[in-house]
């Protein structure tokens, strides 16, 4: 297959990670793939480093420029379909009337209702197939008026690496200045209100009153960073919390941790949680949004509500129960290997492509 993939986001978040995994996986399986992306965006740079052709759209008038670029690419190259990774790319495709030439597929990763204004509805009508990352997101599309036959579910996936060695753990902890006898919880997520990192900061005084050796690493950046740092100071936990900012080599974070905590109040499928489970980390998570499709409480991860007290109780359970940590570590990794690997995600994406092309040709 010949696929044009489009993503106009400038920042690197979970959706862009999935785009990179998809593009690389498609190429490894013999498919021809190219990317249309914002100039000098994190995704454009990483995909280019992977040896895949990238067409970079100017940052000025991004969507209009991308619309023209998409028209030109489709006229010059024999693409069979266009996979849009986020809403800006959909706008560009719609402006360029790409849907009149090729089938459009749109990835959908969050359960917000679709916008009801006339322009938004016109854009959504141009989509041949919505690719929802979970049952929860698929239901939100149906609730917004999208017919079920226009929706396919492809769970997001993560790479499965060998478990860390003791030497890798020790090296990663030295990077963050964590002692061997300290118990390190961590979270990887953008700093916005709905990600809920404040619940972990609020849990920390309760946990450290009994276990002063506990520390917390909050990897990421965003609008709530200053607020979280202020809360940390207010609760007297400054020395116990690391704020390293955005970490490109995120494997170094997972390698350093003893356990992972994911306090999101509104989430798609939670690839950061999947990656932590794949790394063999015993995990605690809410079940908001689609997280309930990943977290099987007491088996693959501890399920709690989004508040500091519940996280504190679960954190203390993990600290005090080595057998529980071992069971969650093994079951969580096994769950990701079987259901949420990058390989599964790519194969299921290919099945959707084939189904769309088959039905388009029949039509």
Predicted regions and their residues:
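A conserved mid-protein helix/loop that constitutes part of the nucleotide-sugar donor-binding site
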Residues: 13-24, 183, 187-209, 223-230, ...
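Short hydrophobic beta-strand element within catalytic cores of glycosyltransferases
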Residues: 36-37, 282-285, 295
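A conserved, positively charged/aromatic
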Residues: 98, 104-133
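A short, active-site helix/loop in glycosyltransferases that binds the activated sugar's phosphate group
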Residues: 127-152, 158-160
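A short helix/loop element that forms part of the nucleotide-sugar donor recognition site in Leloir-type
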Residues: 163-178, 333
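Nucleotide-activated donor-binding/catalytic signature segment of Leloir-type glycosyltransferases, i.e.
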Residues: 229-245
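Aromatic "clamp/platform" in nucleotide-sugar-dependent glycosyltransferases that forms part
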Residues: 246, 265
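Conserved acidic donor-binding segment of nucleotide-sugar-dependent glycosyltransferases
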Residues: 297-309, 317-322
């Amino acid at each position: 297959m010949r696929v044009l993939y489009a993503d106009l986001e400038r920042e690197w978040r979970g959706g862009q990670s999935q785009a990179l995994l998809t593009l690389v996986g498609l190429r490894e399986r013999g498919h021809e793939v190219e990317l249309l992306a914002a100039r000098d965006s994190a995704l454009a740079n990483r995909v280019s480093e992977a040896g895949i052709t990238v067409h970079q759209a100017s940052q000025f008038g991004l969507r209009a420029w991308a619309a023209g670029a998409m028209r030109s690419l489709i006229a010059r190259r024999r693409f069979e379909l266009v996979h849009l990774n986020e809403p800006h790319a959909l706008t560009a495709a719609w402006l360029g009337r790409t849907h009149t030439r090729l089938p459009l597929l749109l990835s959908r990763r969050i359960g917000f209702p679709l916008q009801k204004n006339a322009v938004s509805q016109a854009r959504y009508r141009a989509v041949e197939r919505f690719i929802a990352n979970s049952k929860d997101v698929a239901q939100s599309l149906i609730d917004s008026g999208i017919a079920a036959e226009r929706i396919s579910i492809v769970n997001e996936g993560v790479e499965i690496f060998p478990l860390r060695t003791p030497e890798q753990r020790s090296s990663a902890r030295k990077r963050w200045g964590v002692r061997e006898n300290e118990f390190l919880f961590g979270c990887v997520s953008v700093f916005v209100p709905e990600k809920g990192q404040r619940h972990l900061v609020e849990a920390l005084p309760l946990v450290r009153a009994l276990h002063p050796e506990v520390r917390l690493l909050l990897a990421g950046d965003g609008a709530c960073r200053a607020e979280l740092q202020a809360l940390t100071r207010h609760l007297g936990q400054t020395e116990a919390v690391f704020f390293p900012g955005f970490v490109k080599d995120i494997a170094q974070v997972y390698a350093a941790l003893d356990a992972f905590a994911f306090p999101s109040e509104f989430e798609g499928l939670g690839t950061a949680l999947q990656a932590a489970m794949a790394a063999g980390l015993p995990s605690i998570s809410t079940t908001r949004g689609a997280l309930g499709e990943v977290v099987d409480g007491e088996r693959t991860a501890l399920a709690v509500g989004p508040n500091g007290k519940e996280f504190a109780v679960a954190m203390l359970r993990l600290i005090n129960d080595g057998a529980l940590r071992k069971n969650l570590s093994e079951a969580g990794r096994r769950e990701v290997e079987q259901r949420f690997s990058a390989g599964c995600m790519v194969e299921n994406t290919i099945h959707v492509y084939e189904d769309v092309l088959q039905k388009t040709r029949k039509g």
